């Protein structure tokens, strides 16, 4: 193996470890908000939540879940989420830098437009590629978080039980329910998430962005994650709804398009944004991922990464 290939492998492993660690820490911190967001988003498609028992908002959801299922239940599905999130973020960050070498041919100073487009393409392509590998884990995490049962009334006892139960009933296709719309949504989100962050740092902080303060990086990351979350949220709502009908005898939506149409006509356009406020708050975790990743790179003396040119 040539020295160049060895360096590439070493860089890939390094990016995977740092990105995954940063992601796992931030996800655990915002896990309660993550679960509330998912419950608000999918409750209309849940067989466990009757229409007259649906949560009225963030506060109502927090209070009722804590009271009915216990405070610890706010972290339900978190272990699965961390397991899922480690490879997801690791692959996103690692693939992003590989795609970046291909798509980003200009610096922000040389050509801001091409620099921005290159970052959008590299970020989006990284998200779409990694999604293919980890989608069943993301699917299981959603179903576990949406399970509001207690004791024997729970739908699934854990990650393994969830995956095996859906697989036995629907086969592999059941674990990829909503995958099509997910690709579009993840591309939009990751494009804005990575592309916006790298571009903003390059333009606002200049070529010495690696020396940027923690708070400057966090401020940029916070704005970027909020915007990315809002833009891609309708895609996320549709894919979560599609996930909820896997393993069920009664099919709510015949296709992804049917899901878009029924949500819009039966619940109204605002239904696509249920839980969006929780998502914006949760975005702090996404901002932390970007900043923690950069800080770890600084501490370890690595070049490249999220904040690289």
Curated annotation (Swiss-Prot):
Catalysed reactions listed for this entry: ADP(in) + ATP(out) = ADP(out) + ATP(in)
Keywords, in A-Z order: Antiport, Membrane, Mitochondrion, Mitochondrion inner membrane, Repeat, Transmembrane, Transmembrane helix, Transport
Localization of this protein: Mitochondrion inner membrane
Regulation: The matrix-open state (m-state) is inhibited by the membrane-permeable bongkrekic acid (BKA). The cytoplasmic-open state (c-state) is inhibited by the membrane-impermeable toxic inhibitor carboxyatractyloside (CATR).
Motif Nucleotide carrier signature motif boundaries: 239-244
Pfam (any one): Mito_carr
UniProt superkingdom: Eukaryota
A Gene Ontology term for the protein's cellular component: extracellular matrix
A single MF term (Gene Ontology): ATP:ADP antiporter activity
Family affiliation: Belongs to the mitochondrial carrier (TC 2.A.29) family.
PANTHER family: ADP,ATP CARRIER PROTEIN 1-RELATED-RELATED (PTHR45635), ADP_ATP TRANSLOCASE (PTHR45635:SF14)
Subunit (UniProt): Monomer.
Name listed for the protein in its UniProt record: Mitochondrial substrate carrier family protein ancA
Species this protein is from: Dictyostelium discoideum
